[in-house]
Amino acid sequence: MKRQALTLIPLLGAAAAQSGPYGQCGGNDWSGATTCVSGYVCVYQNEWYSQCVPGTATSSSTTLTTTTSATTRTTTTTTSTTSVPSSTNFPSASGLNFTIDGVTDYFAGSNSYWISMLTNDADVDLVLDHIASSGHKILRIWGFNDVNTEPSTGQVWFQKHQGGVSTINTGQYGLQRLDAVVSSAEKRGIKLIINFVNNWDDYGGMSAYLNAYGGSTKTDWYTSATIQAAYRTYIKAVIDRFIDSPAIFAWELANEPRCNGCDTSILYDWIADTSAYIKSLDPLHMVCIGDEGFGLDEGSDGSYPFSYNEGLDFAANLAIDTIDFGTFHLYPGSWGVSYDWGNLWAITHGAACATAGKPCLFEEYGAPSDHCAIEVPWQTTAVSSTGIAGDLFWQWGDTLSTGQTHNDGNTIYYGSDEYTCMVTEHMERIAAR
């Protein structure tokens, strides 16, 4: 939801003679190409993953740019220097369920795109106190905030794309805001889904990359080597900060990735390649896509969301080894279907996940009004559906030091009557199963 750049070439496929830029070129059980196209060299990442990166056989370094405030610093770092996380007590997929802190169950939660943009730590703590008191265990947040020009002092931004250069802001109004959220979540036992880019233009999105590095379409974004290099530089910067954190539920590729009119191979290759890259940096935390669940034959009624028009194949993407669980969203009002239809959407995705042997997370759902009457039946269906292991409504609302958080029509405010039906009573239904 919330709608209002490295560049990557798609993988050439396991049967190709050479792997493309940033493609996999080796690893345990790898049966594909073991050499790279011209200008790229196969570099060992770990025992199960080697990758084609720019350079020759004698060079395997990339240039990263970071900033702590107004000062830009350029450093050269060997590819994939991220250390393996030291803890194994991280959230995980257990059959068709999730395990959190040793408990395997169905888990509820919510979304808060805005919490990582807050500049008052007390507000962050307040919100997470309320979430912890609700019984929720999972919170999905924005891990991106892309800009093309540096905002005025005091404005939060995470990555600037300008003049063909990616600058990562690690300062007070940069990734230190994510630090505050992760630290607060750790203290309260909340687990975070952190995503890396937005399909939509809010907070920059993929358009910020295209503006800086060239291209005009989503296909360009997914297949540009320059854009994907910047994207991966950012991924690594975030993972490096939180690789040992027990508060990370999963790393998420994007918010609602789409490629309208594209062959499904475009997104499939990007998902496979990017998720493998993330696993090479952090093999212990889970990885998910963040998609809406489009492109599914099983149980389809022929409506638009089941089609492959947005370039997604839910079952094929879910089957990728380096994707730990499925995600799907639900917005009937935006998709031209009825609210009751939402129950079919949930059931069919649960069934697809059960077939794949992986859990599904009902990651976003919302309606602009009548939340209890419309959304509680979706929650009830999700809890009773095999293959669905948790749900996160869109979105959490609260009252901060500056007033109420943004109400996009879908917002459920802490302590409201709708909070009672959507959160308190939902947690009771989960406990009573």
Curated annotation (Swiss-Prot):
Function noted in UniProt: Endo-1,4-mannanase, a crucial enzyme for depolymerization of seed galactomannans and wood galactoglucomannans.
Region: Catalytic, residue numbers: 83-433
Glycosylation site positions: 97
A single GO molecular function term of this UniProt record: cellulose binding
Protein name (record): Probable mannan endo-1,4-beta-mannosidase F
Keyword Lipid biosynthesis: no
Superkingdom of origin organism: Eukaryota
GO biological process terms on file: mannan catabolic process
CBM1 domain span: 20-53
UniProt family annotation: Belongs to the glycosyl hydrolase 5 (cellulase A) family.
Key words of the record: Carbohydrate metabolism, Glycoprotein, Glycosidase, Hydrolase, Secreted, Signal
Gene: manF
UniProt comment concerning the protein's domains: Has a modular structure: a carbohydrate-binding module (CBM) at the N-terminus, a linker rich in serines, and a C-terminal endo-1,4-mannanase catalytic module. The genes for catalytic modules and CBMs seem to have evolved separately and have been linked by gene fusion.
A Gene Ontology cellular-component term: extracellular region
Catalysed transformations (reactions): Random hydrolysis of (1->4)-beta-D-mannosidic linkages in mannans, galactomannans and glucomannans
Pfam families tied to this protein: CBM_1, Cellulase
UniProt cross-references to Gene3D superfamilies, sorted A to Z: Glycosidases (3.20.20.80)
